[in-house]
UniProtKB/Swiss-Prot annotation:
UniProt record similarity statement: Belongs to the DTD family.
The protein's Enzyme Commission number: 3.1.1.96
Lineage, uppermost ranks: Bacteria, Bacillati, Bacillota, Bacilli, Bacillales
Predominant place of localization: cytoplasm
Protein name in UniProt: D-aminoacyl-tRNA deacylase
One GO process term, biological-process aspect: D-amino acid catabolic process
Domain of life according to the entry: Bacteria
Length: 146
């Protein structure tokens, strides 16, 4: 499992002109799932993200988690994170999980994040989405389970 995490001042996701998910501040996640991922991977990533200390304390050091600052999470499914661009000029997505399996694991992942005590908004799995955010910092990390 691969997640691109962005600390966000605000974020939203729109499908067909309608906002389907929106957070005031917290973390925006682009979530990629490969066919080798399991529920164990999803749980690991959910716990890691909830507890990563990437928000500043009073002295400006990254000492607080999204839980500590009472932030929220906007989670977007993103199969293109497993695009392989090493050959040719068109990405190969063979490493991305098949849609049925990916949707199950994506839903499971979001529930695991909620179990950590976070409010989670989502996009619409498999839809063409417009994602808007104000990246705070910017702080952008890639979190992987393997």
């Amino acid at each position: 499992m691969r997640v691109v995490l962005q600390r966000s001042k605000e974020a939203s996701v729109t499908v067909d002109g309608e906002i389907v998910g929106q957070i005031p501040f917290g973390l925006t996640l682009l979530v990629g799932i490969t066919h080798e991922d399991t529920e164990k991977d999803a749980t690991y990533i959910a716990e890691k993200i909830a507890n990563l200390r990437i928000f500043e304390d009073e002295s400006g050091k990254m000492n607080h988690s999204v839980l500590d600052v009472e932030g929220q999470v906007l989670s977007i499914s993103q199969f293109t994170l497993y695009g392989d661009c090493r050959k040719g000029r068109r990405p190969n997505f063979m490493d991305a999980a098949k849609p049925d399996y990916a949707e199950h694991l994506y839903d499971f992942f979001n529930e695991e994040v909620r179990k950590q005590g976070l409010h989670v908004e989502t996009g619409e799995f498999g839809a063409m989405m417009d994602v808007s955010l104000i990246n705070d910092g910017p702080v952008t990390l890639i979190v992987e389970s393997k």
